[in-house]
Amino acid sequence: MAKPDITLRLERPEDYHAVEELTREAFWRSIRGFCDEHLLVHRLRKVPVFIPELDYVAEADGRIVGNIIYTRARIEDPSGITHEVLTFGPLSVLPEYQNMGVGKALMLHTFEKARKLGYRAIVIFGHPDYYPRVGFRRASEFGLTTSDGNTFDAFMALPLYEGALDGIQGRFFIDPVFESLDDKDVLEFDKSFPPKDRYVPVPIKVLLDRLDAGAREAVEGLGCTYLDEFTHRSERDISSATGLDEKAMDIVRQVMLEHGWRWGSKQKEWR
């Protein structure tokens, strides 16, 4: 499919169910067989930290194909002083419109809107090989940690103007709504959508069978049961395993692509 003409606009109440349905489609490939992001979107709109001025949809071919939703979050420094920042997510794009720049368009548009609204920075949890393409850096570079004091490649920050995070260090907190989802609620909410077969994750064996003995041992040492688990880890993280040379990493990228994932920093296009 050729890249579509995309129109960006604010989400309207009459869009809500369609956006939840596209979010369900975008995130259905979950190791547990179903996703909860559509219920999260439903609940996010009802919390005080939701920012309707940054709740944008992307339209193409006469329908909604993408959505980005923002909430206010905070950084708490060691002295207890808090600094307001943004977080976004889910960022959803219909599968058939992924890798066409829809997600990137939504991000760049809303980054500028957020800057004009006076927000200083955006802090997210996301794929560490994708989001640096639009300016995100590891949060640890800014002296930020998660609420429990950890840091990792998938925890990233983007200052919205020069010096926006200067002198600000500490722990990052998001709204409790992100932790409010349990399987019972998700499956009950899911009844309001068309029936959908549970997703079956891809066993790691499909990759192991393509690798030589040394690389196979290295991947086994990562402790992954499913290939899907690589989608949450950076190329830098995976390639650091002893025994995975560039030839092996090329095989990893190829196998990921064969199963529908554009994974790794060398991929030319993503969402």
Please report, for each region that a protein language model flagged, where it lies by residue.
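A conserved beta-turn-beta hairpin within the catalytic core of GNAT-like acetyltransferases
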Residues: 73-88, 98
